[in-house]
Amino acid sequence: MAPEMEEGTLEIGMEYRTVSGVAGPLVILDKVKGPKYQEIVNIRLGDGTTRRGQVLEVDGEKAVVQVFEGTSGIDNKYTTVQFTGEVLKTPVSLDMLGRIFNGSGKPIDNGPPILPEAYLDISGSSINPSERTYPEEMIQTGISTIDVMNSIARGQKIPLFSAAGLPHNEIAAQICRQAGLVKRLEQSKHAAEGGEEDNFAIVFAAMGVNMETAQFFKRDFEENGSMERVTLFLNLANDPTIERIITPRIALTTAEYLAYECGKHVLVILTDMSSYADALREVSAAREEVPGRRGYPGYMYTDLATIYERAGRIEGRKGSITQIPILTMPNDDITHPTPDLTGYITEGQIYIDRQLHNRQIYPPINVLPSLSRLMKSAIGEGMTRRDHSDVSNQLYANYAIGKDVQAMKAVVGEEALSSEDLLYLEFLDKFERKFVAQGAYDTRNIFQSLDLAWTLLRIFPRELLHRIPAKTLDQFYSRDATH
């Protein structure tokens, strides 16, 4: 199958020397016979260099082509354009684990070329909705605020909402280091024998990042020995903007192959989706389309959905794809089109907070605006622990009340607060200092995080823990009276 597909991509099509204009990353061609939407073209410049492009728009005998490597040096005298008759396909193989590629999928780690097991369309194959399986079973990140209060189900898509200057890269690297499937103590031996740990893989796609960030991730994966289960795709800030549009699609095509053909549980991390949205806006402006909110194209919601909706699980296939896109909110504005539309498509969000960061709390995850919509299906008896849901609800309630008391204290002073209010203030401080805060290399499994949560909840008398049933309190509250 693979050789035939390869042969198709090499099929020589018609060549044209009819470039009529260049606009930003786009080339306009006239007198083209039968161009196809999304067809791949090879552009040969006067100096002999070749670039790749893709047909974006067809109007009779006119074709608009976006050039992945940029349009500098393209003229209407010496440039020839060859239409291949193929859509953009990427070679995929199990050997891609442990390798580093550029945003177009070419190896940049001085290793040998990939021997492809298949060539797959980067837009992905459509999935029958009735064949999708509901995401279940928790992915453990080792970060208490995520695991206890915003649990991520296998097959979920949940973004990190961050902003400039916040440690989203460090959090993403920590998740990559620590992420794995939940194992009970009595199950860990069995899981090790069954090779469950070997079944976990990470596909990491960086779009528009600077060299420092790219080196940080590369070094982090290599130093921690997790590189062998990671595939990296790096589109740097000085790489062509247009390449950012295909980078997440190539990464997801690789993830789909690893998940559905190789049976792996794949975690896909996409950073920074704001750079992707800006690339989309640049192409839209070059095409002179009617702009939407803040200059972004009106179809950005649909376009983002074609990326995010590729997460999930399929009936009869062992693997799964879990997505954690990272986006930086310009001016910390959650109403900006990119986070706004992302929030509509994805199943929750994890909010990285500047105030917590300014107080030297790492990871600065604010649990109040954070949400995991599929948490209920990933936790509970048999998956984590029977008290998980109740503990999470009680932590949310007490933290929210603690925030209100803190605001009231600023107005009326501490003397006017009741003894009950002071308990909430004590909880607020200990929750942020002991539960939210943890080291970048401090891994807590879900059972350690739940035990830590109970230590904090014992600050309160039983009567104030309204969200936890009496049966659960009988089992867990009196284990250890100290706090």
From Swiss-Prot:
- Tell me the organism's taxonomic lineage: Eukaryota, Viridiplantae, Streptophyta, Embryophyta, Tracheophyta
The record ties this protein, via NCBIfam families, to: PRK04196.1, V-ATPase_V1_B
Tell me how this protein assembles.
V-ATPase is a heteromultimeric enzyme composed of a peripheral catalytic V1 complex (main components: subunits A, B, C, D, E, and F) attached to an integral membrane V0 proton pore complex (main component: the proteolipid protein).
Similarity field:
Belongs to the ATPase alpha/beta chains family.
* PROSITE patterns, sorted: ATPASE_ALPHA_BETA
Q: Which keywords label this protein?
A: Hydrogen ion transport, Ion transport, Transport
PANTHER family, sorted: V-TYPE PROTON ATPASE SUBUNIT B, VACUOLAR PROTON PUMP SUBUNIT B
Q: Which GO terms describe its cellular component?
A: proton-transporting V-type ATPase, V1 domain
| Job of this protein | Non-catalytic subunit of the peripheral V1 complex of vacuolar ATPase. V-ATPase is responsible for acidifying a variety of intracellular compartments in eukaryotic cells.
| Keyword Metal-binding listed | no
Q: What GO molecular function annotations does the UniProt record carry, in alphabetical order?
A: ATP binding; proton-transporting ATPase activity, rotational mechanism
**Can you tell me which residues the record assigns to a coiled coil?**
none
Kindly indicate whether the keyword Ion transport belongs to this entry.
yes
State the protein's name. V-type proton ATPase subunit B 2
What are its GO biological-process terms? ATP metabolic process; vacuolar acidification
